[in-house]
Amino acid sequence: MKALVIDDERLARTELIRLLEPFKEIEIVGEAVNADDAHDKISELNPDVIFLDIQMPGKTGFELLEELDNVPKVIFTTAY
């Protein structure tokens, strides 16, 4: 399963990726730092699942989802 990690906090992305390492069925195909970056990477990488922060500078995770034509499975990962 291809996964994309989306969070504006570098430490949060790094820690989540570390926690997912034991799950060999999950392949981290990329990271995004905001909604615009995520939109481009979702189109380019076509992940099966995204780990998505809600509160980010600019657009929120919810606003990102509204913009997508094809929405992958979503797991919200937020400290909100």
Language-model-detected regions and their locations in the chain:
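Receiver (REC) domain active-site loop signature in two-component systems and cognate sites
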Residues: 56
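Active-site residues of response regulator receiver
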Residues: 7, 53
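Two-component/phosphorelay signaling modules centered on CheY-like receiver
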Residues: 10-30
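Active-site beta3 strand of CheY-like receiver
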Residues: 45-51
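Helix N-cap/capping motif at the beta->alpha junctions
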Residues: 31-40, 61
